[in-house]
């Protein structure tokens, strides 16, 4: 109901307030986006989740020490042997090293660590059998005086048969620290045969060969290769007022950077599992009494080699 007692000034004030309110409502709607951006009230787009890069490096290069079953007095047998760091060959390339073989470079690094541990344990094993052991040496780096001063050379060589399926693309993945990558998976099998040798040191002629077949194991592996962003073009973005700007657009391209790879870890785990078996077999095969019985045969081979015109490893 209209109040007849309202005075003139009060009526004018109410009229002015109504006009201001009607004008302010659309203005508020116009200003809201800007105010919301400034105050942080606009809904923010959630950042894409970033996956953690799996850690396959833990314990990669550590191998268990071999517990010696017994120990004789060092040097009590009266036989000097050269201890050689274990070597490997690949069935595909028939050569050692990672080049042109089925081992990745990181797998080859794992084997070198394994070989270092095994070389030290084999030397300790020989000493525990009462032998005088020198080494461990790399076979090609043994000097002539060391060869000449030894009765026998002890060598362990591992033949790997490594087979892969074709790696299949799984997905694109955004990783931590703003890294982008492509994830692949596949299967591989690793077969192992260990050969134990006794050599005459100077000629490197084989006195005997014994074998341990460790069979083959199958694995599922996964790796991710990194990608890098690059400027792929530009895109015009309107400012809503008849103008606008050109902004660069970006895309991803592949690189050779490996973000992670489970194969070296799987390889390391298999070597860890095989380690006690091959060391226990070495303890059995490298028998001090048998080696002592071969000393005269080794001397015969050395004399025959020394009288020949071809002297591999001897100074001219």
Regions found by a protein language model. Name each.
Residues 1-19:
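N-terminal secretory signal peptides that target proteins for export/translocation
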Residues 21-37:
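Bacterial N-terminal signal peptides
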Residues 41-131, 241-242, 248-316:
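A structural "domain/chain start" motif
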Residues 98-102, 170-184, 233-253:
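Flexible, solvent-exposed loop segments that connect beta-strands
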Residues 123-147:
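Short beta-strand->alpha-helix linker/helix-N-cap micro-motif
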Residues 140, 144-224, 228-234:
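Surface-exposed short loop/turn segments
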């Amino acid at each position: 109901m209209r109040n007849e007692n309202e005075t003139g000034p009060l009526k004018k004030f109410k009229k002015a307030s109504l006009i201001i309110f009607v004008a302010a409502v659309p203005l508020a709607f116009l200003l809201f986006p800007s105010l919301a951006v400034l105050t942080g009230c606009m809904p923010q787009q959630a950042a894409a989740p970033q996956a953690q890069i799996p850690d396959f490096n833990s314990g990669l290069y550590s191998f268990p020490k071999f517990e010696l079953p017994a120990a004789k007095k060092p040097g009590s047998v009266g036989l000097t042997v050269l201890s050689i760091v274990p070597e490997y060959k690949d069935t595909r390339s028939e050569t050692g090293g990672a080049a042109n073989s089925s081992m990745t470079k990181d797998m080859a690094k794992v084997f070198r660590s394994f070989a270092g541990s095994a070389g030290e344990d084999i030397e300790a094993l020989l000493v525990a059998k009462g032998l005088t052991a020198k080494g461990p040496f790399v076979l090609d780096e043994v000097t002539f005086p060391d060869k000449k001063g030894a009765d026998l050379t002890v060598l362990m060589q591992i033949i790997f048969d490594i087979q892969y399926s074709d790696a299949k693309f799984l997905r694109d993945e955004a990783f931590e620290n703003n890294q982008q990558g492509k994830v692949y998976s596949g299967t591989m099998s690793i077969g192992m045969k260990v050969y134990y040798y006794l050599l005459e040191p100077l000629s490197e002629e084989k006195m005997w060969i014994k074998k341990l077949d460790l069979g083959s194991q199958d694995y599922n592996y996964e790796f991710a290769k990194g990608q890098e962003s690059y400027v792929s073009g530009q895109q015009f973005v309107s400012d809503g007022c008849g103008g606008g700007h050109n902004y660069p657009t970006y895309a991803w391209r592949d690189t050779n950077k490996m973000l992670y790879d489970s194969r070296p870890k799987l390889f390391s785990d298999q070597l860890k599992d095989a380690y006690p078996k091959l060391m226990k077999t070495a303890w059995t095969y490298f028998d001090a009494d048998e080696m002592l019985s071969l000393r005269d045969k080794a001397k015969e081979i050395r004399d025959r080699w020394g009288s020949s015109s071809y002297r591999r490893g001897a100074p001219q």
